[in-house]
Amino acid sequence: EHPALYRRYSKEHTFCKTKNQXCN
């Protein structure tokens, strides 16, 4: 895996959850 990409995905996923949006 690519830690950088995974970290970025995790951050964006958390951001979507914070905004009550779904992440596709």
From Swiss-Prot:
Keywords: Hydrolase, Secreted. Belongs to the CRISP family. It comes from Tityus stigmurus (Brazilian scorpion). Its EC number is 3.2.1.35. Its main location: secreted. The keyword Hydrolase applies. GO terms for molecular function: hyalurononglucosaminidase activity. This is Hyaluronidase. Expressed by the venom gland. Possesses high activity against hyaluronan in vitro. The keyword Secreted applies. It catalyses: Random hydrolysis of (1->4)-linkages between N-acetyl-beta-D-glucosamine and D-glucuronate residues in hyaluronate. It is found in: Secreted. GO terms for cellular component: extracellular region.
